[in-house]
């Protein structure tokens, strides 16, 4: 049965830098906390596990190599016990979870998101379609069958996008066309405008993401929009600085950027710079009616006879296989990664994975 009114949460916290196990434990802690607070939904930032590698914007190639190796070693596969523990936590708390993580698949990393249901099933698995600028040195592109965002659930039509995908007009159009009602605008960690240095444009700083891009997404799509954001501490600055380089000493410019917006773009909540934890919101899906009755860009307020978007969701692989009948074998990335397999409790597990 559809749930139209419920409590949700957005995470604004410091990740477990370069620490897969620590990141999984912290993720489960937040899922437990959200569940105990009565939430039906909790949203995590972009590549929450094992943290966003902001150092890639500031280091040389040689400086990056030890950090990149460690980052890859602590990225997470979707068909892994770490992911299954997170899925079990969602099931134990009967909660929907939007999780951003650095996914390792064979030898390539992806800026990935999953939407996990209250039964522990992975409802949606997606990858950022195009890493941003220097991110291309760390991550690969999403494919045709890994970029769809919106899922039909009992808490509404829930969508997820990473970072600057949230200002991509084509992806917004695609999400609107799916009737999105609740959106996760997942952001990484990067500094506020206090750190802007000419000629770097303001686009590349956190304030426009929090206070322009995210509310614009809400008002253009008429959706409840949760914007989880990572944070940094003095210790985090040290961990994310290569050996031989003097670390920054003031993490405050990286903090306080998470937001939650109503479907009309008005602000629900923003944290103080020293806040670390969950931001809460009481969602009422029926509020979307009055925003979408004014502007539904997938329905009464669009002209598909004049403007249309072509979307290709076919999987493309380097190798095309023939099946036993001589036809082309077809399977999805989801199937290849084992996401269609049912989630089972680990042997001897009788209690929730509360850490």
Swiss-Prot record:
Enzyme Commission code: 4.2.1.66
Parts forming coiled coils: none
Domain of life: Eukaryota
Name of the top EC class for this enzyme: lyase
Record carries keyword Lyase: yes
Active-site residues from the entry: 46 (proton acceptor), 128, 163 (nucleophile)
UniProt cross-references to PROSITE patterns, sorted A to Z: CN_HYDROLASE (PS50263), NITRIL_CHT_1 (PS00920), NITRIL_CHT_2 (PS00921)
Pfam family, one: CN_hydrolase
Keyword Acetylation: no
Stimuli inducing this protein: By cyanide.
Description of pH dependence: Optimum pH is 6-7. Active fom pH 6 to pH 8.5.
Function: Catalyzes the hydration of cyanide to formamide. Degradation of cyanide may be important for plant pathogenic fungi in infection of cyanogenic plants.
Protein name, as recorded: Cyanide hydratase
């Amino acid at each position: 049965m559809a749930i139209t009114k419920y409590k949700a949460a957005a995470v604004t916290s410091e990740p477990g830098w370069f620490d897969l196990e620590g990141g999984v434990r912290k993720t489960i802690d937040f899922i437990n906390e959200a569940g105990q607070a009565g939430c039906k939904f909790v949203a995590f930032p972009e590549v929450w596990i094992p943290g966003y590698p902001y150092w890639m914007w500031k280091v040389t190639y040689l400086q990056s190599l030890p950090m990149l190796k460690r980052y890859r070693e602590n990225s997470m596969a979707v068909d892994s016990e770490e992911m299954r523990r997170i899925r079990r936590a969602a099931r134990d708390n009967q909660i929907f979870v939007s999780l951003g993580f650095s996914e390792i698949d064979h030898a390539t990393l992806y800026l990935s998101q999953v939407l996990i249901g209250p039964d522990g099933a992975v409802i949606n698995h997606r990858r950022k379609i195009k890493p941003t600028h220097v991110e291309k040195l760390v991550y690969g592109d999403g494919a045709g069958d890994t970029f769809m965002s919106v899922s039909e659930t009992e808490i509404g039509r829930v969508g997820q996008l990473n970072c600057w995908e949230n200002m991509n007009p084509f992806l917004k159009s695609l999400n609107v066309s799916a009737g999105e009602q609740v959106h996760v605008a997942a952001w990484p960690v990067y500094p506020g405008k206090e750190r802007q240095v000419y000629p770097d444009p303001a686009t590349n700083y956190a304030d426009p993401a929090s206070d322009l891009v995210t509310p614009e997404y809400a008002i253009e799509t008429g959706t409840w929009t949760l914007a989880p954001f990572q944070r940094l501490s003095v210790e985090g600055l040290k961990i994310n600085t290569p050996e031989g380089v003097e670390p920054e000493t003031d993490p405050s410019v990286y903090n306080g950027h998470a937001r939650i917006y109503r479907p009309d773009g008005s602000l629900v909540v923003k944290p103080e710079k020293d806040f670390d934890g969950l931001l809460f919101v009481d969602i009422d899906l029926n509020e979307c009616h009055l925003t979408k009755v004014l502007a539904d860009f997938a329905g009464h307020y669009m002209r598909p006879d004049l403007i249309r978007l072509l979307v290709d969701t076919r999987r493309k692989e380097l190798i095309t296989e023939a099946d036993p009948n001589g036809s082309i074998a077809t399977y999805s990335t989801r199937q290849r990664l084992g996401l269609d397999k049912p989630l089972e409790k680990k042997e001897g597990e009788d209690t929730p994975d509360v850490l």
